[in-house]
Amino acid sequence: MTTFTKPLSKLIGHFEKFPGIGPRTAQRLALFILKQSESSIRDFSKALLEAHSNVGHCKKCFNLTSEEECDICRNAERNQNIICVVAETKDLLALERAREFKGVYHVIGGLISPMDSIGPEILEIRSLVERVSKSEIDEIILALTPSVEGDTTSLYIGKLLTPFTKVTRIAYGLPMGSELEYVDEVTLARALEGRTNLI
């Protein structure tokens, strides 16, 4: 078994904490970093710190942004009366790649999962209800992962929002447990077109 010097092992360990990064990929990334010039490493470190310090959440939809409101919420050409609810920013990005949805979003920050001690109170569901209750919203589209957690979250949100507006859920041409970020653009576009009433 290959052993690395302590600083290199530490660097590999940090990369292994990244989602989807296994030991081999972490090792490749660490070795790549070591081949870079000192100025490149400084630039990389600066970019990491700047992103961490300056990127926060949109006060309206909780998408990532460096402004008070994200570009989508500030875009006058977007339909502000249709809100697509997603679990994470990565799901929003996947839907934007499909170029089908012309409304705005609400990022709730995860899915209800009692097994992982994630209840609705720690997600941005209350802010969604407030947003809908104070505005003229024509439709809420739930675009949550097809899983037990996604279904639970969709039903919970649906019951809260149905008194205020129409609530639909995107159709799925993918198996249970699939992540939205890995679904191709055509499938996502069709899922939006084929959405159905939740309740």
Curated annotation (Swiss-Prot):
GO MF term set: DNA binding; zinc ion binding
HAMAP family documented for this protein: RecR (MF_00017)
Family per record: Belongs to the RecR family.
NCBIfam families: recR
PANTHER family assigned to the protein according to its UniProt record, in alphabetical order: RECOMBINATION PROTEIN RECR (PTHR30446:SF0)
Residue spans, zinc finger C4-type: 58-73
The keyword Zinc belongs to this UniProt entry's keyword annotation: yes
Name of this protein: Recombination protein RecR
Domain Toprim: 81-175
A UniProt-annotated Pfam family: RecR_ZnF
UniProt key word Heme: no
Function: May play a role in DNA repair. It seems to be involved in an RecBC-independent recombinational process of DNA repair. It may act with RecF and RecO.
PROSITE patterns: RECR (PS01300), TOPRIM (PS50880)
One BP annotation, GO: DNA recombination
Superkingdom, natural source: Bacteria
InterPro entries reported in the protein's UniProt record: DNA_Rcmb_RecR, Rcmb_RecR, Rcmb_RecR_Znf, TOPRIM_dom, TOPRIM_RecR
Annotated keywords: DNA damage, DNA recombination, DNA repair, Metal-binding, Zinc, Zinc-finger
